[in-house]
Design a protein with these regions (language model features):
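Active-site hotspot residues in diverse enzymes, especially metal/ion-binding acidic/histidine motifs
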Residues: 1-126
Length: 126
């Protein structure tokens, strides 16, 4: 699914910006229901950022202010879940899935990411 299709499915407006001098590749503004993506990102990176930012859709500004780390982890988990779902649909045999290759492909580098990939994989195959 493209970023346009993902946003349409979630009922979120999509816009692009030049993120050359911006601190983030994308953001979700709940007050305006807009997801903004850096136009300079590759299509693959835009999709990854889009999935992460859509993971913030249910977060309120107060939740984010009080528990930013938790909200970021939840958004990462949501992104990982959707990327894994797509990846597994493309595989002939899910027994060939290698979580390290998946993590490398999407530049997932933390122990928290590794745990999420394993958890979401097990959740999706059971």
């Amino acid at each position: 699914m493209t970023v346009q299709e993902l946003c349409a499915k979630e009922g979120v407006n999509l816009c692009y910006f030049d993120g050359s001098n911006w601190h983030s590749p994308g953001f979700f503004n709940p007050a305006l229901n807009i997801l903004a993506l850096d136009i300079n990102l590759s299509v693959e990176d835009q999709k990854q950022v889009d999935l992460h930012e859509l993971g913030h859709k249910e977060h309120t500004p107060v939740q984010y202010e009080l528990n930013r780390e938790l909200c970021e982890l939840q958004a990462d988990r949501s992104m990982i879940h959707h990327l894994l779902e797509e990846e597994l649909k493309l595989m002939d045999d899910i027994r060939d899935f290698n979580y390290l290759h998946f993590m490398e492909k999407y530049s997932l580098k933390t122990i928290a990411n590794e745990t999420m990939v394993k958890d979401e994989f097990n959740s999706l195959i059971s």
